[in-house]
């Protein structure tokens, strides 16, 4: 009978650790490996109760394809594979003016599109 008590204690300990982890990551972030998909997320800095502000957040995958021969000829260092990064950007938005005449975009739809602004 004492042996079953130890198994019950171990089982309850494992269950409590699992429940603690479940509550520690509210949006299921522990299940996501890497970056979440491109979608609308609430911007908590600009949002006010009853007036949420949304922005596009998340990741998109890059595309890779064979470099066309005509492009390869113009490269200083020819490469066989060309990649094109895609970013999570607003497909549709509305412009909003906050107090102090701060103008922002409230995103209403997101999609993955070619990145135009790259970090140097």
From Swiss-Prot:
Disulfide bonds join 35-59, 38-88, 56-110, 60-112, 87-115. GO terms for biological process: G protein-coupled receptor signaling pathway; positive regulation of steroid biosynthetic process; regulation of signaling receptor activity; thyroid hormone generation. GO terms for cellular component: extracellular space; follicle-stimulating hormone complex. Its main location: secreted. Gene3D superfamilies: Cystine-knot cytokines. It is found in: Secreted. Glycans are attached at residues 80, 106. GO terms for molecular function: follicle-stimulating hormone activity. Transmembrane segments: none annotated. It comes from the Eukaryota. Coiled coil: none annotated. Keywords: Disulfide bond, Glycoprotein, Hormone, Secreted, Signal. Residues 1-24 form the signal peptide. Shared alpha chain of heterodimeric glycoprotein hormones. These hormones bind specific receptors on target cells that in turn activate downstream signaling pathways. PANTHER family: GLYCOPROTEIN HORMONE ALPHA CHAIN, GLYCOPROTEIN HORMONES ALPHA CHAIN. Belongs to the glycoprotein hormones subunit alpha family. Heterodimer. Glycoprotein hormones are heterodimers composed of a common alpha chain described here and a unique beta chain which confers their biological specificity to the different hormones. This is Glycoprotein hormones alpha chain. The lineage of its organism: Eukaryota, Metazoa, Chordata, Craniata, Vertebrata.
């Amino acid at each position: 009978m004492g042996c079953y008590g130890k198994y019950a204690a171990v089982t309850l300990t494992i269950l409590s650790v699992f429940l603690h982890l479940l509550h520690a990551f509210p949006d299921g972030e522990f299940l996501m490996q890497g970056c979440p998909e491109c979608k609308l997320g609430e911007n908590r800095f600009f949002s006010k109760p009853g007036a949420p502000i949304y922005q596009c957040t998340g990741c998109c995958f890059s595309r890779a394809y064979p470099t066309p021969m005509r492009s390869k000829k113009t490269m200083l260092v020819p490469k066989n594979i060309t990649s094109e990064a895609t970013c999570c950007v607003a497909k549709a938005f509305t412009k909003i003016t906050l107090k102090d005449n701060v103008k922002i975009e409230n995103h209403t739809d997101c999609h993955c599109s070619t990145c135009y602004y790259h970090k140097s």
